[in-house]
Amino acid sequence: MRIAILSQGPQLYSTKRLVEAAQARGHDVHIINPLKCYMNINMRQPSIHIAGKELPQFDAVIPRIGASITFYGSAVLRQFEMMGVYTINDSVGISRSRDKLRSMQLLSRKGIGLPITGFANKPSDIPDLIDMVGGAPLVVKLLEGTQGIGVVLAETRKAAESVLEAFMGLKANIMVQEYIKEANGADIRCFVLGDKVIAAMKRQAKAGEFRSNLHRGGTATLVKLSPEERTTAIRAAKTMGLSLAGVDLLRSNHGPVVMEVNSSPGLEGIEAATQKDVANAIIEFIEKNANKAKS
């Protein structure tokens, strides 16, 4: 098969592992920077070009689109879809998952466990917003943030009011969530592929930090999931319309709650913590499903 990996980072661990796994299984792999692509949107023969040359036909695409280029990256992916190319995650699923508020609304509608979440526009609504999520401590999140950036723990009501007023003054889109104290600074990353969780790790925040992201110094260890956690992760990925997803859960007193569904989960942390060949599993999944899509 000829496989395209949409990525700006050929040197990144996840991209390199996917290339290695695909080549080891005899596939022709190309890393394509979506920002270098331009498109001919044509009802008869849609095409994608780079530097004056039309790209050849691909059998499958693996999107590794960074959050900062979601709009253009999704447009390029849509063009591949128009050309009949199999994509492990489609443009609609990626767009859904990148919109944190929309994600929460979709998951809530499906009855999937979530932290109590509030959203407002006017500073005059701040007192009600704080009460809505159970008061302080609470978590304030920038809707556009990634890797723990733009996530603030407000430990007192006064701090929460100050942070919310500051963000609203900057016209930033934010949401407020209850603080799940019993999680003790740990979350669980479930790696969902199709209708299975193929790997899972517990991420523990470093001392003095509440964000467990590995980019912020958190540590990862193998974890055993409960049946409810496994089911929640699979349902969350399916709700977003994603075949491949990193679903982040917290263990709360009322069961697992979903914090985020990531459409482009990194492989380095999960492969190191679980010693599983996740990259190979992804390529195997593509082989099976790309061929199914053709038949």
Curated annotation (Swiss-Prot):
Residues that bind Mn(2+) 2: 260, 262
Domain of life of the organism encoding this protein: Bacteria
Molecular function in Gene Ontology: ATP binding; metal ion binding; ribosomal S6-glutamic acid ligase activity
Class in the EC hierarchy, top level: ligase
Residues reported in the UniProt entry to bind Mg(2+) 1: 248, 260
Gene Ontology CC annotations of this record: cytoplasm
Enzyme Commission (EC) number: 6.3.2.-
Binding site for ATP: 141, 178-179, 187, 211-213
Protein name: Probable alpha-L-glutamate ligase 1
Species for this entry: Shewanella denitrificans (strain OS217 / ATCC BAA-1090 / DSM 15013)
